Amino acid sequence: MSSLGDPAVLPDGGAWSAWLDDAERIGLVTPAGRDLALPHSLAMAEALVRALPSLSSRQDPGGDRSSSEGTLPAGPRKRVVDLGSGAGLPGLVIAAVLPETEVILVEASIRRAEFLASWSGELGLGERVKVWNGRAETLGRDPAHRGRAMAVSARGFGQPAVVAECAAPLLSIGGVLVVSDPPAAVDAGDLDPLPWDEARWPSDSLSGLGLEALARQSTPFSLSVIAKVRTTPDRYPRRVGVPAKRPLFGTAPPDSR
């Protein structure tokens, strides 16, 4: 699966270049970030693939199996939810390199949602990619989506507490959250996997959402992988906007009023 790190694995490279051109033109990708956009997304896809085999034997030690959240869904396509998809990073890339998946791109902005819908078709992914134009908190309350995802990806979606609270209800037991972190401050000689960043992703707080730390890597990009091991309490996610205003852990952003 190491070949996933090479953008050459993407079909029809010209179409992907045109997609990035359009994303840069309307300000969804910066010129400085463009060159890293595809490699970063491919690294997240690879982290997802590496994590899932190790989860196949996980059991829910105390979760309520009668709840709306079950084990990983059976069937030829596994659901991946990309939070705050923006230009489609990494959601569109995951859909392209993992053809057994269906990918839901969550985007609150109408303009960005229209961009995603248009380009998912242009890239030949329209059948397997759906765009949710709304808030992640709302999606997590929808019985058609709660507890149905094999994986959730998040790149630049929000603070860790917001990501965890919005992702946990969407995941099936045994699923994983793959999230992009700020670059890790490590020496070049240090090896992956890195020790878990307890300050950024406190284990006790994750446990309250039914989550558990799984892996952390610094190369080629800083990523954390978090497993769903038990049912998320029904009270999560809280109302739209509350996870950011009153985070379950960490520090709330300054009030901009």
Predicted regions and their residues:
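Glycine-centered tight-turn and secondary-structure capping sites
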Residues: G86-I94
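Conserved class I S-adenosyl-L-methionine
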Residues: R58, P76-G86
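A generic alpha-helix surface/boundary motif
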Residues: S17-A18, G88, R200
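S-adenosylmethionine
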Residues: G91, T101-E102, A108-R257
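Class I SAM-dependent transferase core
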Residues: M1-G75, R111-R112, S118-G124
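Glycine-rich, flexible loop segments associated with nucleotide phosphate handling
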Residues: L72-V80, R148-M150
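Gly/Ala-rich phosphate-binding loop of Rossmann-like dinucleotide-binding domains
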Residues: A95-P99
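Conserved beta-strand segments that form the floor/walls of ligand-binding pockets within enzyme
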Residues: D82, V93, I104
